[in-house]
Amino acid sequence: MIQIVTVRSGDSVYSLASKYGSTPDEIVKDNGLNPAETLVVGQALIVNTKGNNYYVQPGDSLYRISQTYNVPLASLAKVNNLSLKSILHVGQQLYVPKGTKRAVESIAYLQPSTIPIKESLVNATRAINPFLTYLAYFSFEAKRDGTLKEPTETAKIANIATQGKTIPMLVITNIENGNFSADLTSVILRDATIQNKFITNILQTAQKYGMRDIHFDFESVAPEDREAYNRFLRNVKTRLPSGYTLSTTLVPKTSSNQKGKFFEAHDYKAQGQIVDFVVNMTYDWGWQGGPPMAISPIGPVKEVLQYAKSQMPPQKIMMGQNLYGFDWKLPFKQGNPPAKAISSVAAVALARKYNVPIRYDFTAQAPHFNYFDENGVQHEVWFEDSRSVQSKFNLMKEQGIGGISYWKIGLPFPQNWRLLVENFTITKKG
């Protein structure tokens, strides 16, 4: 069975393999490690242990372990001769019976930054294809005349998806001149002729490439266009061919009357009734232009999911999950250069380079560390690791959420994909 282990001083791949009954090669592969590099104190690794033995880690509880392994809490306590309120001790050995995995859907977004698409990004897409229900190609940009600006090499990306029995998603955005545009959206929503032409172009494009989900990521929509957006989605839904689905992106809200231009036009209840599923952007509490903090802290993520559940069936909700972290320069000041995006693998490499331990915030359920660079400038890094994504998987189970959506492909995080299939059965529809 797979378990998450936190590296302590003196640990090595070989010592951990010996302790947990795994092999060095397996630990290296599952965690995307370079065998020549040392481990970092505080680094989280996934280790395939012998049989059904589990060794308690910092922050563990019977409830958390039962969630992780899909085993009823009472059964876990009984088989280990423990009460439901037993205090666990780090290193304590437990027996964990085999659990039952729930089926979920998964999405990953692909956003090429070059023409042609870098081969490394194409290879990364192929590598995670087995873990996906949908591949979201970001993005087809809406135009004021009802046409679409198409991204590069669409046919190639759609073929990669279908070869892996993954459904390619046609992601349409209201991006104009590099930004989400309320004015552009208003033109499409308020002019019936342009809107009908727009929908026709979308459906023709979807059928041309075999993109069987039509997805609208319309952000910064004017609050006064809320009902017009709902009507537009109903219009699209009535024109969908058989076998096609409709989905949308929702900004993270915690109430129906939440104010602000980013929130008001996204009607959770109406969209939950109209579309087949929604992608909830449950990330970016820590963002490039803000102060250092966890990108997707577990508490705020849970609040958004609970509100979403009150407005629509939980099976329609896809929880957003970042594959990136950020590296901020300190002290933080408004107007500073934006924080640098960083992958999980690159974050651990930074901690190794500057010989600093990785800490873990159990409240936010997120890893972080600080370091001084060669110029004496202090940095603060928040990112994702196996512990943080496992906490999100447990939240999905607790809330009965229908799936998960990743932003974005090209940020290496091998632990995530191994843990995803350890926790869930991924639905394939292609």
Curated annotation (Swiss-Prot):
Its EC number is 3.2.1.-. The keyword Hydrolase applies. Inhibited by diethylpyrocarbonate. InterPro entries: CFLE_GH18 (IPR041704), Chitinase_II/V-like_cat (IPR011583), Chitinase_insertion_sf (IPR029070), Glyco_hydro18_cat (IPR001223), Glycoside_hydrolase_SF (IPR017853), LysM_dom (IPR018392), LysM_dom_sf (IPR036779). It is found in: Spore cortex. The active site is at residue 219. Residues 3-47, 52-96 form the LysM domain. One of its GO terms (cellular component) is endomembrane system. The keyword rRNA-binding does not apply. One of its GO terms (biological process) is carbohydrate metabolic process. Residues 104-430 form the GH18 domain. Optimum pH is 6.0. GO terms for molecular function: chitin binding; hydrolase activity, acting on glycosyl bonds; oligosaccharide binding. It is an enzyme of class 3 (hydrolase). Keywords: Germination, Glycosidase, Hydrolase, Repeat. N-acetylglucosaminidase involved in cortex peptidoglycan degradation during germination. Cleaves only partially degraded spore peptidoglycans. Recognizes muramic acid delta-lactam residues specific to spore peptidoglycans. Belongs to the glycosyl hydrolase 18 family. Chitinase class II subfamily. This is Cortical fragment-lytic enzyme. It comes from Bacillus cereus.
